[in-house]
Amino acid sequence: MTPRNKTIILWLVFLLGLLFHTDLGLMPLFHGLSVTASQAQSMADIAPVMWLMLGFFVPPIVAIIATSFTNSQSYRKFHFGFTILYTVLNFAHLIADLMVQPIIWYQIALMAMLLAIGLLLNWVSFQWLKA
């Protein structure tokens, strides 16, 4: 399998992990427990959070599409830097989750797994850059 194909697959696995991270946060709702983190009164109150989430989910989707159709050296350089950025963001998120009390260890385990996937994505993206 080519590094390009591995890159696409790793981005897809990463996105599935992100979705599961969100799903784990909402799972208590199905057991009658509250997951309320703020006392927002309307969608307008949480609009910035929604935009931030969209801004975090969409770039990997665009990267998957671009990687599927682009093989230029300049794109590969950009893509490698992009994977590094996401690894740094994942590491920061993992550290932030460790600061929340109580620590939700199943989320920490998932975030550590996502960080490992990100590191693998960095490595494969670097291989693709050098190919």
Name each model feature, range by range.
Residues F14-F57:
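Hydrophobic transmembrane helix segments
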Residues L115-A131:
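Membrane-water interface at the C-terminal end of transmembrane alpha helices
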